[in-house]
Amino acid sequence: MPKMKTKKSVAKRFKLTGTGKLKRAQAFKSHILTKKSRKTKRNLRKTAYVSETQEKVMKKLLPYV
């Protein structure tokens, strides 16, 4: 049986933490920022974590990470 391939699109967007959670960046932070408040933009800088239901799917796409 051949090796499983890592989905590179997932590998570049998500990082695995020490506890096994998947860390991701927030969406809505790239453009159209003038109508967003200072507080909103500041909160979008923070990292977010993938939900437990999505985490099961994502970990199948990252077999060697």
Curated annotation (Swiss-Prot):
What InterPro entries does the record point to? Ribosomal_bL35, Ribosomal_bL35-like, Ribosomal_bL35_CS, Ribosomal_bL35_sf
Q: Which domain of life is it from?
A: Bacteria
Keyword list (alphabetical) reads: Ribonucleoprotein, Ribosomal protein
Q: Name one molecular function that GO assigns to this entry.
A: structural constituent of ribosome
GO CC entries: cytosolic large ribosomal subunit
Q: Please name one Pfam family that this protein belongs to.
A: Ribosomal_L35p
- What is one Gene Ontology biological process annotated in the Swiss-Prot or TrEMBL record? translation
The record's family statement is: Belongs to the bacterial ribosomal protein bL35 family.
Please state what the protein is called: Large ribosomal subunit protein bL35
Q: What is the protein's species of origin?
A: Clostridium kluyveri (strain ATCC 8527 / DSM 555 / NBRC 12016 / NCIMB 10680 / K1)
